[in-house]
Amino acid sequence: MKRIRNACELCRRKKLRCNGELTCQNCMVYGEECRYVKRVKHDNRAAVQENERYPILYTPLSTSDHDNDEENEINELKNAVKALDKRFDNFELKLEALFSLLRSQQDSERKVKPGGFPSLVSQILSAGALVDSKLQAYTMRTNFFSNGFSSNDLFPHSFPTWKSAFRDVPDKDWAKTCLDWYFRFINCNWPIFYKKQYMESFEKLYIDKNLVKGAWIVSFYAILALAVSRDKRVDNSKLAESFFATSWFLIQRPGFFLTPQLEKIQALVIMIQFASHLSLYNLCKKLCGQVCLMVKDLNLHKESTDKDLDQDMAELHRRIFWVCYIFETTTSLIFGTPPVLGDLEIECKYPDINYAHCFAENVQGDLIFTCEISLTVLKHEIRTKLYNSNNVFLDKGQKGVISNIQTKILNFERAIPSEMKHYFEILKAGNGLPEELDIIKQHFFTACVEIYLSYCNTLIYLYLADDSIEGSKICLSTARAAIDVIKGFLVVLDPISKNICYLWLFLYCPFTPFLTVFSHLLEDDDLDADICVKDVDRLYSIHAFFLKMKDISGEFAERLSVITENFIQSAEQYLALQNTSVFGTFDALSESFSI
């Protein structure tokens, strides 16, 4: 089959790539006659037949040209071999450098804690791996999570449905009672609404629904859900979920997430709080993501440059940002997801306590709010500077970072308001409440307990990254103190435990001190028998806490209670193998322990 240098008429007409054959492939496909306008002159038919794949006429080379070409080819081949050898040498050097870097990183990781921040799932997996490593020596169970373990095993995936939504406007007096409760006990600690402005919109709702914005309606039903959920009567749980389903349905309408608005952020924050009550932590994560996008679009993380913005609105912007910052940062810590708001260049002032009375009658809530901001900022700094997997700190550099954060923690301790310091001393003493507390003081004391536990977790995160013996001691003593507070106040005292924040998992993950004490039990071979029994008792306290939290966090808390119970049984099994004299004490302890 002959090849032609020019394209055939069909290929030219249809602008196709012609293969120059007769008949060409395109003409065969279209069933057309293949014709070339300019035929190649076949003057040297023998040459064409000898090399018919090439249409250029063949001209024999002279002997001298042939020798020169051969010499050039040999030189090019030698140069290519030399270049290849050089590339192999460079490749070997790079491989050696990579292996050297890997070895140095492995040596560093023996001194420095692992790069990833201890999220809840990673903590549970670490505890399971520790059990496996300890029981392997006794040829016992070697795979604690035989079927694997992930966040899907912890967090429910159900979502609200429109079928259960509350489709009417509730009674005005009843709704006002719910709003008063919200501003009295929730908005004081998480200030995102000016009470006066919100109640003005509430009055408009019962005059004409068209006078209020759709985002306000979302927050209204979400607040009703929060208020009703705190009522411990069983028949009200469905009503609370019905109000929340209404909010959920309203944000599904087209366009809600397309345009950022301050009112939408406020509504989503309330929904995040109630989603925590339903253990819908995956929903919390998704809502936090949408909140972050709106916060960045509205530049709430920066002080406004708008001269026309009054001080009241500027203060509202600050408080909304810091509430979102706490929610998003603590959520990312628990899930182990990258932070969003924490990595922004934050130029936002702390809340002004002079505005506290505008958000709630109880101004003490501002003390709680400001302390939680400071602790969240510290947790984020610990995460980014000590647990960043991309950085392997040298000992000197790591100690410098730890020392710097220690200074900031000391400054935080000195800045704690006197009202809270008094309660902190009570928590450390562990002797129970010295006086009767009214409802307002009970809420404030519960919030102080949660701030103290958040403070303890901050210390644990810091000293987990410290390889020194002193750091390990501080980490263990802090974990024991945190568990003692949980046992003495949140498990035993019902008036205090009933006020626990729905966001307890994000603010202070109780599994963090649990894992610290649990690891010490299994890793310390010289542990005193009396101390060992006390530590096991502490582990049972965390188990009891999760059982108690079933009323607040439902299915999620129940799953955590099962996980901690399995870990405690494994610890008792291992310790019994190590020291049979202690085993009888464990049996008596597990039988007598009750919540």
From Swiss-Prot:
It is found in: Nucleus membrane. Pfam families: Fungal_trans, Zn_clus. GO terms for biological process: DNA-templated transcription; positive regulation of transcription by RNA polymerase II. The chain crosses the membrane at residues 209-229. InterPro entries: AtrR-like (IPR050987), Transcription_factor_dom_fun (IPR007219), Zn2-C6_fun-type_DNA-bd_sf (IPR036864), Zn2Cys6_DnaBD (IPR001138). Its main location: nucleus. GO terms for molecular function: DNA-binding transcription factor activity, RNA polymerase II-specific; RNA polymerase II cis-regulatory region sequence-specific DNA binding; sequence-specific DNA binding; zinc ion binding. It comes from the Eukaryota. Keywords: DNA-binding, Membrane, Metal-binding, Nucleus, Transcription, Transcription regulation, Transmembrane, Transmembrane helix, Zinc. Residues 8-34 bind DNA. It is a single-pass membrane protein. GO terms for cellular component: nuclear chromosome; nuclear membrane; nucleus. This is Uncharacterized transcriptional regulatory protein C1773.16c. It comes from Schizosaccharomyces pombe (strain 972 / ATCC 24843) (Fission yeast).
